[in-house]
Regions:
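Radical SAM [4Fe-4S] cluster-binding motif and immediate context
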Residues: 185-263
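Short glycine-rich His-centered loop
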Residues: 1-28
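Short beta-strand segments
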Residues: 4-7, 54, 78-80, 106-107, ...
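N-terminal [4Fe-4S]-dependent radical SAM core
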Residues: 9, 15-19, 153, 159-209
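Glycine-rich beta-alpha loop elements in corrinoid/cobalamin-binding modules
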Residues: 35, 42-176
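A short, charged/proline- and glycine-enriched loop
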Residues: 1, 73, 205-206
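Residues at the starts of beta-strands that form the adenosine-phosphate
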Residues: 2, 49, 103, 257-258
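Conserved alpha-helical elements of sugar-nucleotide-dependent glycosyltransferases
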Residues: 28-38, 241
Length: 263
């Protein structure tokens, strides 16, 4: 199955959606879409064809996104979300539905918390993957291909087409225990993204963003990720897995001057 992953636009703005406090930052800060990249890398490792488009970083507006979707002709479209952008995100889903019959899946912090409201508000939206969605995306693609029951996929919400459109939430998707199950994301960055379009102000440029693990014991008021996405139990990648990716960056992306760990 061909899966189109996108960090969608927010109007014409340079909107940094992946950071703890999403927004248009005066410094020009722009985070990598590392959550999407992990899901894309995993999907490719399971023999799906992937495409990743980061609209805010590449200054691509909604019309540009729609054109890319028409050009790529995906079977499944995965859109990231955030609370500041959600109204525009849902409008984007409606626009996408006008040009394709591909299934549309939303992921991220806002839809994880407000899945019921988002499905009710947007009839064009097919699915929501809640929490750590890496495996959910791939399992959904495989279920759609094989026409097997999607009710068995954990971490999913959707509209039941056989029961008057009632909304269904499947079992909770537990956080990934073995972080080495996730493939490296640096090769995904190299193929689909432009490092010069990302900025972390205290890092040398161009920089790249990785994670050493997921989960956080802290309860910072400005960060929803532990409560919504990855929980409070910190799970780390093994040193060989992590160092191997760093060496790959050194050898294959010599322009990178610094690696930022966004744990």
């Amino acid at each position: 199955m061909k899966i189109f992953f996108t960090n969608p636009p927010l109007r014409e703005l340079h909107f940094s959606r992946s950071q703890r406090s999403p927004g248009v930052i005066k410094s020009g800060t722009m985070y990598y879409p590392y959550w999407l990249a992990h899901a894309a890398a995993l999907a490719e490792s399971r023999d799906h064809e992937i495409y990743l488009l980061d609209c805010p970083a590449d200054f691509i507006n909604r019309d540009g996104l729609l054109q890319q979707i028409e050009d790529q002709k995906p079977d499944l479209i995965v859109l990231d979300t955030s609370t500041p952008s959600i109204n525009f995100d849902l409008q984007t889903v409606e626009k996408i539905r006008q040009i394709t019959d591909a299934k549309i899946l939303m992921v991220g912090t806002h839809v994880t918390s407000e899945w019921h409201h988002c499905l009710e508000a947007c009839p064009a939206l097919d699915f929501i993957a809640m929490g750590e969605y890496d495996f959910t995306v791939s399992e959904l693609a495989e279920s759609l291909e094989s026409k097997s029951p999607i009710r068995e996929i954990a971490g999913l919400a959707y509209r039941d087409q056989s029961n008057s459109g009632s909304l269904i939430q499947t079992d909770v998707r537990l956080p990934i225990e073995d972080m080495d199950e996730l493939p490296w994301i640096a090769p995904i960055y190299k193929r689909f993204l432009t490092p010069e379009n990302y900025l972390f102000t205290i890092a040398s440029q161009p920089m790249i963003m990785l994670i050493g693990g997921r989960g956080c014991k802290a309860k910072c008021f400005y960060c929803v990720y532990p409560q919504v996405m990855h929980g409070h139990n910190y799970r780390t990648r093994s040193l060989p897995h992590l160092i191997g990716e760093m060496k790959w960056i050194e050898q294959n992306m010599p322009e990178i001057k610094e690696i930022v760990f966004e744990d």
